[in-house]
Regions:
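C-terminal edge and immediately downstream basic/flexible tail or linker adjoining helix-turn-helix-like DNA-binding
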Residues: 2-4, 14, 113-114, 119-126, ...
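Structural recognition of an alpha-helix C-terminal capping motif at a helix-to-coil junction
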Residues: 36, 50-57, 70-82
Length: 180
């Protein structure tokens, strides 16, 4: 039985051989995780949906450039990342990052959760784009260091360094507002 990575390569090969329907399983497999990443990077569901769709279109149009030794997810994530950064560059002040800190119970609990969410979003926005990206990929998408490195195109050591710096900065910021 083929693993996901091998299945992806077979599907890409079929697409390159003219079977465009072979791209559909790739979309089905990766649409949700890519959309979730775009939503976290952009803070806007509409922009995330547009960016995700654009990433799939560009991936399909450029399948011939896919290195079959690389994971398809890492490759298409790079395309999505570029799409998201283009959106961010074209924006005025950044929309808040969605952070799921939902509370259950009373309206007071919901209000408190909203306040915490806003404070954490502000802290995340205080990070550099590189730091915020690795935090989102590691803690919200739960990618491994190797997967983050492949997705962002930087060495694993750089990923770890950015993550360490981001965690240190977040600890300071969250301590200042009494969230840790």
């Amino acid at each position: 039985m083929l693993n996901t990575s091998d299945e992806d390569v077979v599907l890409v090969q079929r697409c390159l051989a003219g079977d465009s329907s072979a791209f559909e399983p790739l979309v089905e497999r990766y649409q949700r995780p890519l959309y979730n990443l775009a939503t976290r990077l952009l803070g806007s569901r509409d922009e995330a949906l547009d960016s995700t769709q654009n990433a799939f279109v560009k991936a399909f149009e450029n399948l011939a450039s896919f290195d079959q030794g690389q994971k398809f997810f890492s490759w298409i994530y790079q395309i999505l990342r570029n799409e998201c950064f283009n959106v961010l560059r074209g924006r005025r002040p950044s929309a808040p990052l969605p952070v799921d800190l939902t509370a259950s119970g009373t309206p007071a609990d919901a209000f408190e959760a909203d306040q915490r969410r806003a404070l954490v979003q502000a802290a995340l926005l205080d990070l550099t784009e590189d730091q915020r990206e690795v935090v989102l990929l590691r803690h919200f998408t739960e990618l491994s260091y190797d997967e983050i490195a492949a997705s962002t195109g930087v060495p694993v050591k750089t990923v770890k360094s950015r993550l360490y710096s981001a965690r240190q900065r977040l600890a300071v910021l969250l301590a200042e507002i009494n969230l840790v």
